[in-house]
Amino acid sequence: QGSNGAGKSTLFNSIAGNFLVDSGRILLDDENITFTPEYKRSKYIGRLFQDPLRGTAPHMTIRENLALAYLRAGEHTKMFSRVSKKDEEKFRDVLKQLDIGLENCMDVPVGTLSGGQRQSLTLLMATIVPPKLLLLDEHTAALDPQAAEKIMALTNQIVLDNHTTCLMITHNMKSALSTGNRTLMMNQGKIIQDLNEDDKKNMDVDT
């Protein structure tokens, strides 16, 4: 949580490996990943952005996008690995979670989907192989309230079901206090407030 320019996205970019940090270390599951290349981190760090257009290949089908995400994050090391029929059944099952009928439209180009549908798909792509860490960069901010609520509910379900460590950026104080077990407030690149579950129970948006 924090205002524009507080350093939230810079923090995420450094964790994801978009650039190397000048000092300090980045540890994930007690492993030092400070100098691990971005493409290697992407196998175990999932990320969603505010813009539903990011994170998918719009001219490719739902099936092809899920296959790319699955092969990238999985243990497949061959450049031309293929997904099996069993894998495709897995894709269909995860799409059913959305309850919007996409499991019956797997050959539809992703570019034809609405913002909410595409962000739902992006969330599934980021978690189809459960990551060690999920980064959510205001992933509901560009959606209408109804779609945002549905995406947030799906996010909570996936995170809880997979026991995934998750960091979420939001400008919405209500979301910051109601989601997760810890809330950090940032300003000028520094953490200025660290709220645990008990702290959050005693606060509201007017505090």
Regions found by a protein language model. Give the residues of each.
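Helix-to-loop junction immediately C-terminal to a conserved catalytic motif
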Residues: 16
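Conserved ABC transporter NBD signature motif
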Residues: 24-32
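ABC ATPase NBD coupling module
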Residues: 32-46, 54, 77, 84, ...
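Q-loop/switch helix immediately C-terminal to the Walker
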Residues: 60-72
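A short, proline-enriched helix->beta-strand linker immediately N-terminal to the Walker B motif
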Residues: 128-132
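Catalytic Walker B motif of ABC-type/P-loop ATPase nucleotide-binding domains
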Residues: 134-137
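H-loop/switch region of ABC-family ATPase nucleotide-binding domains
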Residues: 170-171
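Conserved beta-strand-loop-alpha-helix hinge in the C-terminal portion
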Residues: 190-207
